[in-house]
């Protein structure tokens, strides 16, 4: 579980985009293992079809998720864990607030059950409730985790190793 800090415009998001293959390196190559399945939480997620209901949007990723404790949860039950209870699951995505949409994007990402989770500024726009749920999920997450954030408190809680990406491209690390 690795956390990455850096000043604005130091290349943190570019680094994540290189890892996931969103962009190609100017030189060299980037190789991803054949069993690697990325879950990439971006700062500004896109919703191609906001007419879907919250539940339909999540079910596009999976009907069920097997949590780290072996518990099998339906998409609806997993949504409830993230505060999407009752009628809101049948509301169109277009009716959600910005923070709710980001939370929904996170739930869908986690429902896809990636083995390499990449979070780019995950604490932006999340309320305390969502932050607590995310922290609890990350504590028990068994895959690779790479987080970029300016939130040192959050990083100290969920990352094992922290790196600083300098504007000149150098990396310094500390635990």
Predicted regions located by residue number:
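ABC ATP-binding cassette signature C-motif
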Residues: 1-175
């Amino acid at each position: 579980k690795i956390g990455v800090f850096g000043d604005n415009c130091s290349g943190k998001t570019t680094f994540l985009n290189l890892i996931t293959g969103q962009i190609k390196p100017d030189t060299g190559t980037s190789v991803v293992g054949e069993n690697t399945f990325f879950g990439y939480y971006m700062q500004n997620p896109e919703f191609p079809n906001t007419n879907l209901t919250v539940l339909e949007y999540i079910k596009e990723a999976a009907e069920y998720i097997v949590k780290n404790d072996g518990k099998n949860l339906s998409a609806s039950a997993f949504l409830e864990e993230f505060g999407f209870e009752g009628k809101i699951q049948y509301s169109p995505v277009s009716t959600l607030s910005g923070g709710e949409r980001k939370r929904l994007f996170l739930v869908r990402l986690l429902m896809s059950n990636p083995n390499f989770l990449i979070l780019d500024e995950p604490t932006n726009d999340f309320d305390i409730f969502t932050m607590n749920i995310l922290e609890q999920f990350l504590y028990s997450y068994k895959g690779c985790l790479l987080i970029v954030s300016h939130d040192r408190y959050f990083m100290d809680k969920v990352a094992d190793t922290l790196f600083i990406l300098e504007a000149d491209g150098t990396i310094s690390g500390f635990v």
